[in-house]
C-alpha cells in the first residue's frame, strides 16, 4: 500500500540524457530489469554512495569512476552483486566492458548499479544479452519506463520533475528513485538518478547532490537498515544555452539548487510513502535542540522504535513509547521537565508529563489518519531537524519473510 502516492507526475525530458530499458530475466522471465542511461558528451556527473562497509561491487566501481569521463550508467535489478567478493567486482567490470564494447567508449566511462538479493552471483551473461535491446530503446522520453525498470519490492514507480526559466532559457531537472525496504540511507535498498540540462562544473555538482541528499534521502527511514547498494546520482548535460555554473552562488545556481532539492525531496518522500507494508506516512519534527545532531538522534530514536511504529500501525496513541525513545536517544544532560510532545496539533505531553488538556480520544483521532506528525520540543536551543518514516505492519514482515521465496 502506497500512502498518498498517486500516478507518476509528468517527467520532462532532459536534453542530452537518454534512457533505455530491456529484459534480462534476472529474477522473473520477461521483467524489464536492465536500464541503460546515456549522458551527452561533456556531461558532468556526481554522486553520493552508501557508507555501509559491505558496499556492493558496483558501488566500489562507480565511486572510482564518477569523477572521470562518464557516458553511460548501467543498472540491473533482481541481484545486488553485494557480498560477492572479488568475483563480484569481476562481474561488474564485465558488464561495463560489454556495454563499452557495444558503444565504442572506454569501460571506465560506464558506471554500474545493482539492486536486489544480496550474496548471489551476478548473472553476467543475462545482463550482457540484454544490453543491445536497452541501447536500441534509448530515448529522452523514457523516464517513466526507467522508473518502473529500477523497481524491486516497490509497488509504484517514483519520479519528479521541475522546470524554471533563466534569461529566457528553460532549465529542466528530472529524477527517479527506487526503494521500499532496507531504507535508512546514509551517504547517501535506494537508488536515485537526477538529471538536468544545466551546465555545471563537477565540483559544484558534487556539493549540490551531497547537500540535496543530506536534506532528503538522508532524512528518511523505513526500517533503520542501510543498504549495501545505496547511491544517488546527479548528471548535468550542459545542453542548455547558458553559462557554466562554476560557483555555488548567483541567481542561476540558486534556481537550480531549489529545483534539485525539490526533486530530491519528492522522490525521497515517495520512497517512504511506498515503504514495504506502510499504512502511515509519519513526519518526526524535533525542535529546540542544542545542535543538529541531537535533534537527529532524537528523531531517529523515535522513527526507528519498533514499539512506536507498531503503535502507529494500530492507531494507538501510546505516548509513553515516544517519551521512552526520546529519553534513550543519548542527548547529554537532557532535562525532561522541558520536553513537550505533540501528535498533530494535539499536545500529549507537557514538561515531561501527560498534558492536562490531553484526552485519549484526541490522540486516537490523530493516529487514525494516514499522515501523522510527531513534534518534539526539547527546550534546549534553536536547532531543528525533520525525519520521515512509516509505521510497521504485518505486511512488512510478510514481504521480507518471503523476499527470497
UniProtKB/Swiss-Prot annotation:
<keyword id="KW-0012">Acyltransferase</keyword>
<keyword id="KW-0068">Autocatalytic cleavage</keyword>
<keyword id="KW-0028">Amino-acid biosynthesis</keyword>
<dbReference type="GO" id="GO:0004042">
    <property type="term" value="F:L-glutamate N-acetyltransferase activity"/>
</dbReference>
<keyword id="KW-0055">Arginine biosynthesis</keyword>
<comment type="pathway">
    <text>Amino-acid biosynthesis; L-arginine biosynthesis; L-ornithine and N-acetyl-L-glutamate from L-glutamate and N(2)-acetyl-L-ornithine (cyclic): step 1/1.</text>
</comment>
<feature type="binding site">
    <location>
        <position position="189"/>
    </location>
    <ligand>
        <name>substrate</name>
    </ligand>
</feature>
<dbReference type="Pfam" id="PF01960">
    <property type="entry name" value="ArgJ"/>
</dbReference>
<keyword id="KW-0963">Cytoplasm</keyword>
<dbReference type="GO" id="GO:0005737">
    <property type="term" value="C:cytoplasm"/>
</dbReference>
<dbReference type="GO" id="GO:0004358">
    <property type="term" value="F:glutamate N-acetyltransferase activity"/>
</dbReference>
<feature type="active site" description="Nucleophile">
    <location>
        <position position="189"/>
    </location>
</feature>
<feature type="binding site">
    <location>
        <position position="405"/>
    </location>
    <ligand>
        <name>substrate</name>
    </ligand>
</feature>
<feature type="binding site">
    <location>
        <position position="400"/>
    </location>
    <ligand>
        <name>substrate</name>
    </ligand>
</feature>
<feature type="site" description="Involved in the stabilization of negative charge on the oxyanion by the formation of the oxyanion hole">
    <location>
        <position position="115"/>
    </location>
</feature>
<comment type="subunit">
    <text>Heterotetramer of two alpha and two beta chains.</text>
</comment>
<dbReference type="InterPro" id="IPR016117">
    <property type="entry name" value="ArgJ-like_dom_sf"/>
</dbReference>
<feature type="site" description="Involved in the stabilization of negative charge on the oxyanion by the formation of the oxyanion hole">
    <location>
        <position position="116"/>
    </location>
</feature>
<keyword id="KW-0808">Transferase</keyword>
<dbReference type="InterPro" id="IPR002813">
    <property type="entry name" value="Arg_biosynth_ArgJ"/>
</dbReference>
<comment type="pathway">
    <text>Amino-acid biosynthesis; L-arginine biosynthesis; N(2)-acetyl-L-ornithine from L-glutamate: step 1/4.</text>
</comment>
<dbReference type="InterPro" id="IPR042195">
    <property type="entry name" value="ArgJ_beta_C"/>
</dbReference>
<comment type="function">
    <text>Catalyzes two activities which are involved in the cyclic version of arginine biosynthesis: the synthesis of N-acetylglutamate from glutamate and acetyl-CoA as the acetyl donor, and of ornithine by transacetylation between N(2)-acetylornithine and glutamate.</text>
</comment>
<keyword id="KW-0511">Multifunctional enzyme</keyword>
<feature type="site" description="Cleavage; by autolysis">
    <location>
        <begin position="188"/>
        <end position="189"/>
    </location>
</feature>
<dbReference type="GO" id="GO:0006526">
    <property type="term" value="P:L-arginine biosynthetic process"/>
</dbReference>
<feature type="binding site">
    <location>
        <position position="152"/>
    </location>
    <ligand>
        <name>substrate</name>
    </ligand>
</feature>
<protein>
    <recommendedName>
        <fullName>Arginine biosynthesis bifunctional protein ArgJ</fullName>
        <ecNumber>2.3.1.35</ecNumber>
        <ecNumber>2.3.1.1</ecNumber>
    </recommendedName>
</protein>
<feature type="binding site">
    <location>
        <position position="178"/>
    </location>
    <ligand>
        <name>substrate</name>
    </ligand>
</feature>
<comment type="similarity">
    <text>Belongs to the ArgJ family.</text>
</comment>
<dbReference type="GO" id="GO:0006592">
    <property type="term" value="P:ornithine biosynthetic process"/>
</dbReference>
<feature type="binding site">
    <location>
        <position position="276"/>
    </location>
    <ligand>
        <name>substrate</name>
    </ligand>
</feature>
Amino acid at each position: 500500500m502506497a500512502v498518498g502516492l498517486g500516478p507518476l507526475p509528468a517527467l520532462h525530458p532532459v536534453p542530452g540524457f537518454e534512457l533505455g530499458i530491456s529484459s534480462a530475466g534476472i529474477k522473473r522471465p520477461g521483467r524489464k530489469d536492465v536500464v541503460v542511461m546515456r549522458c551527452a558528451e561533456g556531461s558532468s556527473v556526481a554522486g553520493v554512495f552508501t557508507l555501509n562497509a559491505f558496499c556492493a561491487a558496483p558501488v566500489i566501481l562507480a565511486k572510482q569512476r564518477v569523477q572521470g569521463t562518464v557516458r553511460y550508467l548501467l543498472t540491473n535489478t533482481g541481484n545486488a552483486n553485494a557480498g560477492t567478493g572479488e568475483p563480484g567486482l569481476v562481474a561488474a567490470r564485465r558488464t561495463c566492458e560489454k556495454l563499452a564494447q557495444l558503444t565504442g567508449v572506454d569501460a571506465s566511462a560506464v558506471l554500474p548499479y545493482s539492486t536486489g538479493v544480496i550474496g548471489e552471483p551476478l548473472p553476467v551473461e543475462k545482463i550482457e544479452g540484454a544490453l543491445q535491446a536497452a541501447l536500441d530503446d534509448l530515448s529522452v522520453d523514457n523516464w517513466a519506463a526507467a522508473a518502473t525498470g529500477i523497481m524491486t519490492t516497490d509497488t509504484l514507480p517514483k519520479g519528479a520533475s521541475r522546470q524554471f526559466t533563466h534569461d529566457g532559457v528553460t532549465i529542466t531537472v528530472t529524477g527517479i528513485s527506487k526503494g521500499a525496504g532496507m531504507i535508512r540511507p546514509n551517504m547517501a535498498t535506494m537508488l536515485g538518478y537526477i538529471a538536468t540540462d544545466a551546465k555545471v562544473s563537477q565540483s559544484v555538482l558534487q556539493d549540490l547532490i551531497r547537500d540535496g541528499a543530506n536534506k532528503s534521502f538522508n532524512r528518511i527511514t523505513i526500517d533503520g537498515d542501510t543498504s549495501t547498494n545505496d547511491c544517488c546520482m546527479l548528471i548535468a548535460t550542459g545542453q542548455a544555452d547558458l553559462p557554466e555554473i562554476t560557483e555555488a552562488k548567483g541567481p542561476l545556481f540558486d534556481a537550480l539548487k531549489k529545483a534539485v532539492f525539490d526533486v530530491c525531496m519528492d522522490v525521497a518522500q515517495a520512497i517512504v510513502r511506498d515503504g514495504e507494508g506502510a499504512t502511515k506516512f509519519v513526519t518526526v519534527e524535533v525542535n529546540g535542540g542544542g545542535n543538529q545532531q541531537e535533534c537527529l538522534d532524537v528523531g531517529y530514536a523515535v522513527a526507528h522504535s519498533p514499539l512506536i511504529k507498531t503503535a502507529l500501525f494500530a492507531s494507538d496513541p501510546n505516548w509513553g513509547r515516544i517519551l521512552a525513545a526520546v529519553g534513550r536517544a543519548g542527548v547529554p544532560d537532557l532535562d525532561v521537565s522541558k520536553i513537550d510532545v505533540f501528535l498533530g496539533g494535539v499536545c500529549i505531553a507537557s514538561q515531561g508529563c501527560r498534558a492536562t488538556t490531553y484526552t485519549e480520544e484526541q490522540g486516537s483521532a490523530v493516529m487514525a489518519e494516514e499522515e501523522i506528525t510527531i513534534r518534539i520540543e526539547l527546550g534546549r536551543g534553536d536547532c531543528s531537524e525533520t525525519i520521515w518514516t512509516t509505521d510497521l505492519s504485518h505486511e512488512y514482515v510478510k514481504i521480507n519473510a518471503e523476499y527470497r521465496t
